[in-house]
């Protein structure tokens, strides 16, 4: 009788793990959340005017090929991810709104990002690719407000 109760508890525990854990893993890392996390980190660096290429966390968010391209281009690298040019309209009070993702292929996503501040509104499109189990930003382009 006691063995039966233990066996039932073990089976129920395995069922709970099987049902709830995969959903928790999927919910924890979506392209939208990844892009929002990147911009929350990036905007702090933007306001501090740091050289983004010296940041150790950049390769965690951005694809190596894009980093190499930006290093070769050597344009105002700080402004690439916001597509705002050299204006300093962003500040730490800027709100980042990430809209619904569009899945292009199994490993490529299009994520619209809106920057809203007191005196500005800007929209960019983040192209995010999935390599293995992690996401990386492959490219950013500007967009018209929609």
Task: Name every feature range the model reports, one short phrase each.
Residues 29-46:
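Short, aromatic-enriched amphipathic alpha-helices that serve as compact interaction elements
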Residues 63, 67-118:
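Surface-exposed, charged secondary-structure patches
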Residues 38, 58, 135:
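Hydrophobic pocket/interface hotspot
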Residues 9-18:
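Bacterial N-terminal signal peptides
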Residues 34, 47-75:
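Short, well-ordered alpha-helical segments enriched in acidic and aromatic residues
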Residues 24-27:
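Boundary at the C-terminal end of the N-terminal hydrophobic targeting segment
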Residues 121-146:
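Short beta-strand edge/turn micro-motifs at domain boundaries
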Residues 1-10:
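Bacterial N-terminal signal peptides that target proteins for export
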């Amino acid at each position: 009788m006691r063995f039966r109760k233990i066996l039932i508890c073990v089976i129920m525990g395995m069922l709970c793990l099987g049902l709830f854990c995969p959903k928790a893993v999927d919910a924890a890392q979506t392209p939208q959340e990844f892009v929002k996390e990147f911009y929350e980190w990036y905007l702090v660096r933007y306001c501090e005017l740091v050289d983004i290429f010296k940041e150790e966390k950049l390769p965690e968010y951005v694809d190596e090929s894009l980093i190499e391209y930006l290093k070769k281009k050597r344009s105002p690298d700080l402004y690439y991810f916001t597509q705002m040019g050299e204006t300093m309209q962003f500040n730490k009070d800027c709100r980042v709104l990430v809209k619904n993702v569009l899945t292009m292929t199994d490993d490529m996503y299009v994520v619209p990002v809106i920057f809203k501040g007191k005196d500005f509104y800007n929209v960019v499109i983040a192209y995010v690719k999935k390599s293995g189990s992690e996401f990386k930003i492959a490219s950013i382009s500007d967009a018209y407000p929609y």
